Design a protein with these regions (language model features):
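Small-residue-enriched hydrophobic alpha-helices in membranes
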Residues: 1-129
């Protein structure tokens, strides 16, 4: 099921970092969640090194939504997993602000992921906290 190449994982991780930073609070918990995402797709790689690369990509990019093209090309199962990781990062600080909600709406629209399913993932994660 979990099949993404290294470059895709770096790009999607950069999007996760961007999502974590959008509320201007990039915590260690959020970094750990991004590392968990990396480990779930690249088991034999050094997740700290990949995270550092993703942070550099995020810092040097002015249009991170380009990485949604990488997501869009994948199966619905992988899209769902990525959306779940994005929501985990967002709710890790126990608040969802308007910028985070707007970002998720935009990402879901760009990758053709159903709003209803996105909302179900969000509710499932909120209820499991």
């Amino acid at each position: 099921m979990k099949k993404l190449d290294r470059e895709s994982v770096i790009g999607i991780s950069a999007l996760l970092v961007h999502t974590a930073k959008i509320d201007e609070n990039y915590s260690e918990d959020e970094k750990n969640l991004v590392r968990n995402f990396i480990k779930s797709y690249l088991e034999s790689e050094d997740e700290k090194k990949i995270l550092k690369e993703a942070e550099e990509v995020e810092n040097n990019s002015n249009q991170l939504l380009n990485y949604t093209n990488t997501i869009k090309k994948n199966s619905m199962v992988i899209k769902k997993d990525i959306i779940e990781h994005l929501w985990k990062v967002i709710i890790s600080d126990n608040t969802i602000d308007q910028y985070e909600s707007n970002l998720m709406r935009r990402i879901c629209g760009l990758i053709y992921f159903p709003d209803k399913e996105c909302a179900e993932i969000k509710l499932k994660l909120l209820n499991s906290k």
